[in-house]
């Protein structure tokens, strides 16, 4: 009988250990599972989701000149005072979700922002998002008439400058193709307060530089050889003309680091370049 009691007690003790072990393992498993679920949710959150979650007011406006009509995305800061304004010129993918999210982030920083969709109402498509894929949008970008692009930007400039929520001071920020257009627009519009060129090229003709009145600020990835090979010539032309051209090159970052550096899975150099460039941009816009 004593022997049976001893066996029974051993069985109960072993069962208790086994039960506690399972309970702790399950608790640890749930913690790990929850972390994986959180990380996955963050990684899967798209630019469209972030835009949808934004508390700021967004609206589409229809602008026109001559017989052309085009769309522009406007993002308002949360303030009761007039603010400085910014024109965002999209990259060669058109006014996609990322470009609109960037406009929203500038509004979060306190600026009234307009982002014209420069391929809207071209090739039978009302907006960039109506194109079949980024390649189709890119083809439409490179088919644009340069004079039409300038006219579109002029209309966007006047619209945002005259908005009652604007102080009338307007800066321009552009990326890739839009960065090159930003440099060019500084030649065509002497009223802009500053031009911010993200991995875009400068003009090839030195004579055009004479028309620039705003300071030009460049933001370049260290591994973007195609664009960076043009910096020295731009710097010389600007210096010879007595114009302001200041730039930073972010070591290890590639082309389009502002878009790629925003992604959850961004490589470290692109992420660091993204963060440094954001801080610099906001400091310069103040």
What are these regions, as identified by a protein language model?
Residues 16-19:
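C-terminal motif of bacterial Sec signal peptides marking the signal peptidase cleavage site
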Residues 21-24:
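Bacterial signal peptide processing site
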Residues 29-47, 51, 63-161, 259-262:
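Serine-hydrolase catalytic machinery in alpha/beta-hydrolase-like enzymes
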Residues 164-175:
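Alpha/beta-hydrolase fold nucleophile elbow
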Residues 174-178, 182:
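Gly/Ala-rich beta-loop-alpha elbow adjacent to hydrolase catalytic centers
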Residues 191-201:
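A conserved short beta-strand
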Residues 244-286:
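C-terminal catalytic histidine-bearing segment of alpha/beta-hydrolase fold enzymes
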